[in-house]
Every structure is written in C-alpha cells, then in structure tokens.
Amino acid sequence: MPQLNPAPWFSIMVMTWLTLALLIQPKLLTFTTTNPPSKKPSLITKPTPWAWPWT
C-alpha cells in the first residue's frame, strides 16, 4: 500500500509546516486588531430570579 510509505509525504508535511511557521505566521502576527481590549472592568449585572408558577 503506498499510503503507508511516509517517504514522499513526510517531507511535504514538514516543508508546509516550516513555511507556515517561518514565513506566514510572522506576517500575520504584525497585524493589529481592529478593536483592542480595554482595561475597564466589565459591568456584571446580577440576574433576577425567575418566578416559577408552581412554587
């Protein structure tokens, strides 16, 4: 079965991951987010309890 022979496919996989890690990823990490996170504390509201009709 040729699927079990990793010789041609392992090198393709390694080259693909190296390309992703060394060339594409640093370019993607330089982009800034459109909405940076703020340092304000979030307003947490306490939910009102549900009035169950059978209690």
Curated annotation (Swiss-Prot):
Membrane topology label: Single-pass membrane protein
A Gene Ontology molecular function term of the record: proton transmembrane transporter activity
CC annotations in GO: mitochondrial membrane; proton-transporting ATP synthase complex
Segments for region (Disordered): 35-55
Top-rank taxon, per record: Eukaryota
Any single Pfam family the record assigns to this protein: ATP-synt_8
Entry keywords, A to Z: ATP synthesis, CF(0), Hydrogen ion transport, Ion transport, Membrane, Mitochondrion, Transmembrane, Transmembrane helix, Transport
InterPro entries: ATP8_metazoa, ATPase_protein_8
GO biological process: proton motive force-driven ATP synthesis
Keyword Lipoprotein belongs to the record: no
Transmembrane segments: 8-24
The UniProt record lists the keyword tRNA processing: no
Localization annotation: Mitochondrion membrane
Subunit structure: Component of the ATP synthase complex composed at least of ATP5F1A/subunit alpha, ATP5F1B/subunit beta, ATP5MC1/subunit c (homooctomer), MT-ATP6/subunit a, MT-ATP8/subunit 8, ATP5ME/subunit e, ATP5MF/subunit f, ATP5MG/subunit g, ATP5MK/subunit k, ATP5MJ/subunit j, ATP5F1C/subunit gamma, ATP5F1D/subunit delta, ATP5F1E/subunit epsilon, ATP5PF/subunit F6, ATP5PB/subunit b, ATP5PD/subunit d, ATP5PO/subunit OSCP.
Function: Subunit 8, of the mitochondrial membrane ATP synthase complex (F(1)F(0) ATP synthase or Complex V) that produces ATP from ADP in the presence of a proton gradient across the membrane which is generated by electron transport complexes of the respiratory chain. ATP synthase complex consist of a soluble F(1) head domain - the catalytic core - and a membrane F(1) domain - the membrane proton channel. These two domains are linked by a central stalk rotating inside the F(1) region and a stationary peripheral stalk.
Family: Belongs to the ATPase protein 8 family.
The protein's name: ATP synthase F(0) complex subunit 8
Gene: MT-ATP8
